Amino acid sequence: SYLKGLDLLGFKYEDRTEPFQGASGATHPVLAEAVTQFQSLAYKELLPADGPVRTRVMGQPSKAKSDQAERVKEFMNYQLMCEMPEYEPEFDQMLFNLPLAGSAFKKVYYDQAIGRCVSKFVPAEDLVVPYSATSLDDADTIMHIIKMPANDMRKLQVQGFYKDVELGTPAYSEDDIKESKNDLEGVSTTNKDEIFTLVECHVELDLEGFEDLGADQLPTGIKMPYIVTVEETTQKVLSIRRNYDIEDPMKRRKDYFVHFKFLPGLGFYGFGLIHMIGGLSRTATAALRQLLDAGTLSNLPAGFKMRGIRVRDEAQPLQPGEFRDVDAPGGRLDDAFKILPFKEPSQTLLALMGQVVAAGQRFASIADLQVGDGNQSAAVGTTVALLERGSRVMSSIHKRLYSSMKKEFMLLSNVFATYLPPTYPYDVVGGEKQIKATDFDSRVDIIPVADPNIFSQTQRIQLAQTGLQMAMSNPGMHNLYSAYRSMYEALGVKDIDTLLPPVAEPAPMDPSVEHINVLSGKSIKAFPNQDHTAHMKAHLAFMGT
């Protein structure tokens, strides 16, 4: 289970007394390694320093649309990287939890308490949907479990966001998953922690007095989307809010949540590494502990020593380094000691553990990619094919994250379009820019800056290097400038123009210079303001020589 799988991370050392006191409690890091490798790769690719958003123009391009797309891109990157300080740590934490649980959620909404848009990470255990739901889109009920400090609750009541009712002393409780996570972190709650548990229900209701009316102005009986917030202990309703636009004739539900999946599961929730390689991690841990225990017993042998025929504490197992008294008749000193025949750690068990670990690493795509160790004379596409074959799992996961981030940016743009003033100026480094609320329309598509087909810098460099090799193999058919520029971009070089000056634009030349270029295999170009008749006469005369 997910709860037991958290122990396989090895964050907490287990003090064991079986099979002997002080037996190894080490945990093999194959699962922790896979999680951190994925988190570091995804974080770097999906959240670059310049911002995660790029835009593209929908429909026929024009200068107005291009300017609009540029404004949207700059503003959203500015908001995410500067004005929303919680975005980076929340995204970072989400990427660490995602490969463990298999599912993670982001909640995008306008926070009344701080007066701006936020995008918060929601663990899978804090979001509940009906059993029959297969996605957020077809779930008729979505319940979000919210832990809120008493002071924050009072602020929202005073602001009028929640109904000002007496809630009493909060009775905070934790589920098994939260307790396990706190145990791994080494933290605990106290009785002084005043935290309310709220249940925010995104439901469909047919409320009396607010019925859906048909063309004849009679109730249709159709349920409409609402958000109902209830305090868990007192079960008092704190708020009921409409969850659709008044102008929308279809009265469609507004979306607030984005589902990130590591791997598709059998139902609503996705599968994570605990589900897929948890058994391998447990097997590797058991083998590792047996090898360490065998080494301990071999290095610190135990046995018996003679002292009569009775054995003291014969019911207790021997400990490493222990020589227990044995009541026996006298004799030679060599005969007074008996070392138990502990074997060295099994090489077969060691090899088996290596195979188990390799299987887990291969599945999680964290095995070292020996790209530089291949045959340098191999075909150009061979290395790329090997790289792609060894990383199919990571590539598919990256595409799922790309799709979820695209939906997250769409929800963010909807919030900006709703709450921004008609024109919103903001300061940036070296100047001032502005955005319009009307810029967030269907003419601009907002997508992640990451390439869904490329998930690591290693892959990006290898593809650029392959393209450069092909261009150098036949320079006459390729643009070497573009090939070298792509290589520098893959390497992450910032000042490319200083290393690779742009190709100079062709300028008008006199006929004699054009003759020299033709002889050297260079192309020539005609310009509008040239004397074309004189040029043609000169070229014909040159061809006749």
What are these regions (language model features)?
Residues 98, 108-112, 120-121, 347, ...:
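Extended amphipathic alpha-helical segments with heptad-repeat/coiled-coil character used for oligomerization
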Residues 28, 51-81, 258-275, 304-319, ...:
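Surface-exposed loop-to-helix/strand elements on domain peripheries
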